[in-house]
Amino acid sequence: MTTRFKKNRKKRGHVSAGHGRIGKHRKHPGGRGNAGGMHHHRILFDKYHPGYFGKVGMRYFHKLRNKFFCPIVNLDKLWSLVPEDVKAKSTKDNVPLIDVTQHGFFKVLGKGHLPENKPFVVKAKLISKTAEKKIKEAGGAVVLTA
C-alpha cells in the first residue's frame, strides 16, 4: 500500500506523540536502574540474568588445593626417561642423573626391575622403601629434594 507520508511524518502536530499529556514520556515509570527486579521486572531478570538474585554458599579461605597431588613413576619406566645420548655415554664411573620432577613426577615407586649393570642417580621429592632398596642394590643412589 502506498502512502503519501513517511511514518515519521504521521504524528506531526500531535504534541506529546502518544506519550500522555502530563508525564510526556519523562521520568522513570518503571523505577530507576535495576528496580523491580524481584517484582514488575522479574521476567526480564529471570530470562536474561538468571542467578542475579539469591544466595550462594560460603567461600573456603586458605584451602590447600592439590594438597595430595603426587604423580608417580615406577622403576621399570625410569631408564626410559634418560636421553639416548646420555645412555650411550654412561659408564661405571659416569652414571646418569635422572631428575624425575623435570619429567613431571614427584614420587618413585618400586614396581619392576632396573636394567642390569646400569646404575644411576635418582633425584625425587619422595621415594618408596622398595624403590630405594632396588636402586641401591643396582649400585645407584637416591637424592631427595624439597
Curated annotation (Swiss-Prot):
GO terms for molecular function: mRNA binding; structural constituent of ribosome. Pfam families: Ribosomal_L27A. Residues 1-14, 21-30 have a biased composition (Basic residues). GO terms for biological process: translation. Keywords: Ribonucleoprotein, Ribosomal protein. Coiled coil: none annotated. GO terms for cellular component: cytosolic large ribosomal subunit; cytosolic ribosome; mitochondrion; plasmodesma. Residues 1-35 are annotated as: Disordered. Belongs to the universal ribosomal protein uL15 family. HAMAP family: Ribosomal_uL15. This is Large ribosomal subunit protein uL15x. The gene is RPL27AC.
